[in-house]
From Swiss-Prot:
It is found in: Cell membrane. Belongs to the G-protein coupled receptor 1 family. A lipid is attached at C337 (S-palmitoyl cysteine). Residues 1-33, 97-115, 175-210, 281-298 are extracellular. The modification Phosphoserine is found at S367. Residues 55-75, 137-153, 232-259, 320-382 are cytoplasmic. PANTHER family: NEUROPEPTIDE Y RECEPTOR, NEUROPEPTIDE Y RECEPTOR TYPE 1. One of its GO terms (cellular component) is neuron projection. Receptor for neuropeptide Y and peptide YY. Signal peptide: none annotated. The gene is NPY1R. This is Neuropeptide Y receptor type 1. One of its GO terms (molecular function) is neuropeptide binding. It comes from Canis lupus familiaris. The chain crosses the membrane at residues 34-54, 76-96, 116-136, 154-174, 211-231, 260-280, 299-319.
């Protein structure tokens, strides 16, 4: 790094280390400064995402935890996903926005290390929560008579995810540094006593190896696995619909199963789409940062980062849009009313492996009245 001209601070260009992505300090020309109107617009956008991310995920967590009948495998994993999104909204958005605009770190050494560490942990937890949800849906639909995860399995899976996330993020606690090194040869008064926060790996090869590993661990690998699971689910449901008899209850259950699968798949697709621009930006910058013009770096990074952060709002939006129970409970939540079980009002949706479809043999032997009772008893409430 050329500290004399100081055209850039060292890069933090990995998928999870988005908030510490290198800042270009183009103090030689005012042309590189963002217009006030653009800064104001970005501030409003970031503020809106923070508010939606925090309130939406907090409401979703509170509603699911308060309603005992909603504590099934899928909803437990949804709570874990929302909690990780909540951490990202709190620990990432405000710090990243301020750091990118100011081009120097003002939050102290402890936050310099904790900020990227917590962000990396949160994103790892988010993507692997989606993996576990895909596995749960796969077993429920593809192999209903085989092994099916229960609530205890979900808690164990969540614990394993957090351990994996913490271990894979440890390099940020080790190599993240707060230093004034880039400013030591700068004579401008505006940059005196200023610090930057970035990762200082032993070598570029170490950094590139680690960032490439995280790219596969946090994005491409899990998403490929998830889409394979949902593709198999789609094929099975399509065959089941073609073979399904014309019983109204069967058609109702099939419709509800399809709706909940669309909701879960939509969350995955939104995650992949939101994170794609920042993933491409970081990958390109990691391997050939000269491609990105100095004056366009901060604006381009903020736009990519803001798009990625929208993913923190997706979970409660899709969950609420496709779940009438959540919409009703959300009204109670914002009206500060007590949550209470409303068995008569809840729609029934086969969300969890805790209560799966009864076998075809038992359905054939059951009378229409008994069949309807089985359906009502076996469907999950979310």
């Amino acid at each position: 790094m050329n500290s004399t001209s100081f055209s850039q601070v060292e890069n933090h260009s990995i998928f999870c280390n988005f908030s510490e992505n290198s800042q270009f300090l183009a103090f030689e020309s005012d042309d590189c400064h963002l217009p006030l109107a653009m800064i104001f617009t970005l501030a409003l956008a970031y503020g809106a995402v923070i508010i939606l991310g925090v309130t939406g995920n907090l409401a979703l967590i509170m509603i699911i935890l308060k309603q005992k009948e909603m504590r099934n495998v899928t909803n437990i994993l949804i709570v874990n996903l929302s909690f990780s999104d909540l951490l990202v909204a709190i620990m990432c958005l405000p710090f990243t926005f301020v750091y990118t605009l100011m081009d120097h770190w003002v939050f102290g050494e402890a936050m310099c290390k904790l900020n990227p560490f917590v962000q990396c942990v949160s994103i790892t937890v988010s993507i692997f929560s989606l993996v576990l949800i895909a596995v749960e849906r796969h077993q429920l639909i593809i192999n209903p008579r085989g092994w099916r995860p229960n609530n205890r399995h979900a808690y164990v899976g969540i614990a394993v995810i957090w351990v994996l996330a913490v271990v894979s993020s440890l390099p940020f606690l080790i190599y993240q540094v707060l230093t004034d090194e880039p400013f030591q040869n700068v004579t401008l008064d505006a940059f005196k006593d200023k610090y930057v926060c970035f990762d200082k790996f032993p070598s570029d090869s170490h950094r590139l190896s680690y960032t490439t590993l995280l790219l596969m661990l946090q994005y491409f690998g899990p998403l490929c696995f998830i889409f394979i699971c949902y593709f198999k689910i789609y094929i099975r449901l399509k065959r089941r619909n073609n073979m399904m008899d014309k019983m109204r209850d069967n058609k109702y259950r099939s419709s509800e199963t399809k709706r909940i699968n669309i909701m879960l798949l939509s969350i995955v697709v939104a995650f992949a789409v939101c994170w794609l621009p920042l993933t491409i930006f970081n990958t390109v910058f990691d391997w050939n940062h000269q491609i990105i013009a100095t004056c366009n770096h901060n604006l381009l990074f903020l736009l990519c980062h803001l798009t990625a952060m929208i993913s923190t709002c997706v979970n409660p939006i899709f969950y609420g849009f496709l779940n009438k129970n959540f919409q009703r409970d959300l009204q109670f939540f914002f009206n500060f009313c007590d949550f209470r079980s409303r068995d008569d009002d809840y729609e029934t949706i086969a969300m969890s492996t805790m209560h799966t479809d009864v076998s075809k043999t038992s359905l054939k032997q059951a009378s229409p009245v008994a069949f309807k009772k089985i359906n009502n008893d076996d469907n999950e409430k979310i």
